[in-house]
Amino acid sequence: MDHFDYKGGRLHAEDVDMAEIAAAVGTPCYVYSTATLTRHFQLFDEALSGMDHLVCFAMKSLSNLAILKLLGDLGAGMDVVSGGEYARARAAGIPGDRIVFSGVGKTREEMAEALSGGIRQFNIESEPELRTLSEVADRLGATAPIALRVNPDVDARTHEKIATGRKTDKFGVPIKRAREIYALAASLPGIEVVGIDVHIGSQLTSLEPFEQAYLKVAELTHQLRADGHDIRRLDLGGGLGIPYTRCNEAPPLPAEYGALIRRTVGELGCEIEIEPGRLIAGNAGILLTKLLYVKEESDRRWLIVDGAMNDLIRPAMYGAHHDIVPLNETQAGVELQEADVVGPVCESGDTFARARPMPPLAEGDLLAFRSAGAYAAVMASEYNSRPLVPEVLVRGDQFAVIRARPTIDEMLGRDRLPGWL
């Protein structure tokens, strides 16, 4: 469900005509729906109702301060994977005790900053990281609450680049070594064992891999408690997928996911943490672009838009599909014609769609790339010296720019010429 719909033949974000945003902000730009973000968070919160739980938004998917504050005001915690994300969460008003710190490469400086801010939990990914955190905490006279991220060797059946729970992936420690490393953690100064963490991948469209992983976590919980560890939290990660095309079979709903959690680990009496990102943000955003040129040869047609791979890298990086629709609603019965939708960047990889059936379009028409709320703006770059795309948040009939497009002078101003040139 999202709140981008045609009204009177024009695509709207909630109650705002998208053309109005394009006129005020320019294109390309990202547009997010407050109503969609709110509803998607609430679906997860409701799915775990009656259980002690915290929904920690995976802010690597979308980290604008306005979005973080919106979700934080709804009661969300945050899952961060860098010192920069931690700083963003705190700047958005998220208290330390609602932040979990994940990631395989935490630095000593990041650990110290999070400890000083009363971090809820570190998700530890390796034995060397555990020893380093112990040293940092002991030096500060602090206690670091930790959950060990276990790798259950489960195939998430997702894209190769976003699978994280196989033994060949860089994440976590083999579940067979977990008891050994928990024993080490209990012996180290400055470390408090509070739970277990697991995360097997992103964009999962079946509950079966989750079930395999969570049953292994349940078994490990019993073993660790028998070993004397106070396992009171289970961080079950995120990864539930979204439909990137309306023709696809819909992935499981949060309610079904919540039922699985109750069935697999609900009797353990643990507080449950989950880290959804894509399902909260993915369909809550679109990339708004303008058609620059229609290029036609005898056997091929290209639609060249002003958005590019530096703005939305997912098609180039993952071969990802995004529905692309005109702001003016296509009438029933209109003949579609195949076209490649491409951007201005000087690479053949700057292609959003190949042989995509598209309605008749003219230069200057506006197009919306759907399902562009997650892993989109956060992965943008200034490749080809193109300014970062602005972000816009809509609420009802209002909209506001929540990240401005930098000027060329601002981009150039970050460079420095050494005096010897």
Model-found features: residue ranges?
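Hydrophobic "anchor" residues on beta-strands that sit immediately upstream
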Residues: C56, P145, R233, E271, ...
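A charged N-terminal "starter" segment
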Residues: M1-A144, A183, L188-E192, E219-H222, ...
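Conserved, mostly hydrophobic/aromatic
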Residues: L37, K60, S82, A114, ...
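Short acidic, glycine/serine/threonine-rich loops at helix termini
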Residues: L68, A91, M111-S116, L133-V136, ...
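Conserved beta-strand positions in the central sheet of alpha/beta enzyme cores
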Residues: D79-V80, N123, A147, D197, ...
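Active-site-proximal loop/turn and secondary-structure-junction residues that shape catalytic pockets
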Residues: M59-S63, G84-E85, G105-K106, S126-P128, ...
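Active-site loop/helix belt of alpha/beta enzymes
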Residues: P152-V294, M358-L361, N384-R386, R395
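Charged (often Lys/Glu-rich) extended helix/loop segments that serve as interaction or gating elements
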Residues: L260, E267-L421
